[in-house]
Every structure is written in C-alpha cells, then in structure tokens.
Amino acid sequence: MVLARLLTPSDFGVVTMVTTFSLLFRSFGLNGFTELIMQREGISHSLASNLFWIDLGIGTMLTLAFAGSGPLLALFYHNPAVAQVAEGMSLTIGIGCLGWIHIGLLQRAMRFRAVAVINAIALLLYVIVAIGLAMAGWHYWALVWAAVTHALATATGACCVCRWIPSWPRKASGTGSGFKFAMNVYSHFAFSYITSNTDNLLVGWRYGARPLGFYKKAYDLFVLPQSQLLSPLSAVAVSTLSRVSGDRERFRRYFLQVISVLALLGMGIGADFALVGKDIIRLVLGPGWEEAGRIFTLFGPGIGVMLLYNTHGWVHLSIGRPERWLRWSLLEFGCITSLFLLALRWGPSGVALAWTVSYFLLMFPGFWYAGKPIGLGVGPVLAVIWKFFAASVGAAFMTVLILRAVPAFAMRPGPTGALLRMSSASLLFFGLYFVGVILLHQGPKPLNETARLLRDLLPENTSRRSSPASFGTEGVSAAPARCGEVKSPSNSVQSPAISNRKHDDVNTSVGTSSEPDTRATSNKYSS
C-alpha cells in the first residue's frame, strides 16, 4: 500500500474507470479455457493448440477494439485522461492471451507451486514498476505500465515454466464442444464481472474519479480475504469435487466440511474488520484516505457471507452444469444492480452497504439452486454455519461494550493510536470468538479442521495432492505431474508426456492467476 502514499485517490480513480472494462476482456482466456482443461479427462495436443490460437485470435481483436473505445469511455466519464489510459491498458489484453493456456496446463499437472511462483514474481515486478514510476512523478501512468509489466511477466513465466509449444491449428475432436463449454463458463464470468463492477461504473459516472478512488481501495481490502483464502482453496476443491461428483454422500461431506472452515475464518475476519476497519485504513493507506475507512466498515459484515456464497460456483462447475451457473448469474445481476441503483443516492458508502446486503439475500437461494441437481439442500448448509455467525455477532457485541468502557483508549490520535486500537480490539474479539465457537461446538473440532486445511494448502503440500486428506477424500488424490502429463481424474495413473505429436494428451487441474486489480480474478468461481 506504499502506492496509496505516493498517488492520489484521483489517480486510482482514473485507472479504475478503465479497468472496470479492460479486466473483463483481459480474463477471456483465463475464465473458460482453464476450466475446460480441468473438466476434460484427456486433451490432445491438437485440441490444446486450437484453444491457444482461438484465445490469441479473439484476444487480439479485443485488444484493438478496446484501444479504439477510449474516446467513448472518456465521453461517458467526462474525463479526457481516460482515453489514453484505455490505449495503454489494451496491451494487457493481448499480452495475457499468450500465457493462459500454459497456465492451464501447469494447473492440470498439479504444479500449483510453479503457478504461485510465477504470480508472485509478476506481482513483485508490478509493485517495483508502480512505485518507481510513482516516485518519478508519472501519476496514474505508474499504474498503467505496472499492469502491462504484470501481464508480460505472467505470460513469459508461464511459457518458460511450461515448455509446451502449440502446433498450427488443425481439425481436432472436441474443439467445437470444448469451445461451447468454455463460452458458457466465460459468459457466466462476464455476467458476474459486470455485476461486481457495476458499482465502479456507477460511482465513477455519478461522483467522479476521487470518490471512486476511495471506494476502490475499500473494495480491494474487502475482497482480500477472498483472494487469499477462497482462490487457493478453489484450486483444490473444484478438482476434488469433480472427482467425487458421482458419489453424492462424499460430495456432500467434503463440501460441507470445507464451507465449515470458510465460515470459521470468514465470519471472524468479517466481524473484526467491521470493528477495526477505519484504523486498518489509517495504518495501511496513511493520511487523506479517511473516507475509504468509513466505506470499508460497511463492507466488513459481508466478508464471511461473501466467502460462503461464492462457493456455490464450485458445485455448478464440478458437476458439469455451467449453463445453470450462467442462468443464476442473470438473476444475481438483476438483484445486485437493483440494490446499487437504490443505494447510489447515498454515495459510495451506500453502494458498499448494498454489496453486503446482496450477499445476505442471495446466499441461501444460491446454495439451493446449485445443489438441486445433486440433492444438496439449504438445511445442511445452515446447520454448518449458524454457530459461527452467532459466535461472531456475540463476540463483536462484547468487544464493543468492553472497549467503550475505556474512552481514553478510543481517543488516542495518530498511527500509534490506530495500531493500539486495532491490535487490542482484534485480540479481544478473536479471543471471545474462539471461546464462543468452542462452546457452541462443544469442543475445538472446527479449529483443528481449519489448521489441517491450512497446512494442506501450503504450496509444498498442494503440489503433492489434489485435496486435503483430512476431509475424507481418500481415493481421489493425485500425484504430481510435469506440465503436459496425462492423468485421468478418476485415478492416479500417469501417461506419456505431451509433445508436438497429434495424439498426445495433457492433464487437468484448476487454479487461479493473481492480478493487481482484484476484480478480474477474485470471483473466478463466484457468481
């Protein structure tokens, strides 16, 4: 968050006006083709090559179209700087298409650690370039060229690590059906993305770049738990659920145990952020960002529900029903957009509250609709999560009462006061929260399961198995493979490595790629 001290809210706002649109096109190959690579039991070299050229061709057209749309965006936002920023950001679309298929092949080969290293290096380069250019006085251009650097580093790293070379396009079995599957997934992502970015569009259009900059930073912190918790877990969960989708009892058991862990973490983090949100902003972003802190406290209560709600996408994808996912996203779009329009009169704070309300309204209907084909009802989900919700509300209430008894504590000024309030309130809250969880569950079982899952999600562990053994998924784990090796999702037998021969196969897994702007990837499996 050093950038928040070097750039102004208006700088972030101008770039967000553009990335609201550009990240939708930037994610074309990431959302759809990687899921296809995961879903197929075997993918020939010819099919993988066809996917690469389709991705590159469509990506090139999107790059040119977006670069030419700059004047229209500038007219919409009444900000001439938007046109030039759009031209620069268009480069990220075409560059990204060079590496998405390679990322998918690495994920299929269970090489999550390699993908994590690529993403970490790309993010580090993004930060270095952005800070360097910001210190040199480049203002919002620092963010633009940092994004281009990130796209180039991700694509280059993927191609270097996964040394797969596509052949020229040719007729290959499954190209048409595979493309249709990918378009269903991407169509869902597009509706979901439009839904989750309508807030940016409305705030930028109605209130301008500066309020949008405040809102954007608050939103980034809001979805941080999702990108740090849900995205790594999705890489394991979707693959595992796909393999046990034929056994309803195992599917139900694994899914409920995973959302139990997410409920423990999400409800606690969400309630704590609602308590200390303003001080987090003071510490992380520095002076001048107080409005972002007020907005963030309205996001906080929705964090836990957001994490849980977004897991219903795992069900749609793992049972091979992306068309149901797409239909749900249409309903979701109507609901959330209506709430945004109703709340817009109250400014960015009203829109933030609309987000929180929308997750509470949609969570249980979303689980009901996703689980209907396999008999997963709302009752089991509610039975798993209500105790965590009750514990978080009770702990937050007690924390507020205790801290109000120390008025001098609340009035301490400056960063030191913010750090003291944040650390003390968080320690007190989590102490009370964990006590409440243990009492309601009559033991520490949820805490033990969470500890086991977090250990299993460490890179060295996820590179060895596809699912946490502690969640009862014996028989579906898979050994690691090199990029391009074949491994059937139903067993762990390995086949020859991929080459440029016509009938060679490549393997399946799933994951996510990191992005400086959280909007493109944080909801990869969300609705």
Task: For the regions a language model picked out, list residue spans one by one.
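Alpha-helical transmembrane segments of multi-pass membrane transport and lipid-handling proteins
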Residues: W53-H78, Q84-G88, I128, G132, ...
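Hydrophobic transmembrane helix module of multi-pass membrane transport proteins
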Residues: S22-R26, D55-T198
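Membrane-interface junctions at transmembrane-helix termini in multi-pass inner-membrane proteins
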Residues: L36-H45, I95-N119, A136, W141, ...
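Helix-loop junctions and terminal segments of transmembrane helices
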Residues: S27-H45, Q107-R108, A218, F222-G266, ...
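Membrane-proximal transmembrane or re-entrant/amphipathic helices at the cytosolic face
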Residues: W368-G371, L376-V378, V400-R501, D505-T508, ...
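Interhelical loop/hinge segments that connect adjacent transmembrane helices in multipass membrane
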Residues: R113, T156-N197, L201, P211, ...
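Alpha-helical transmembrane segments of polytopic membrane transporters and translocases
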Residues: M1, P9-G29, T92, D199-L201, ...
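Membrane-interface helix-loop junctions in multi-pass transport and translocation proteins
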Residues: V2-T19, G70, L75, A83, ...
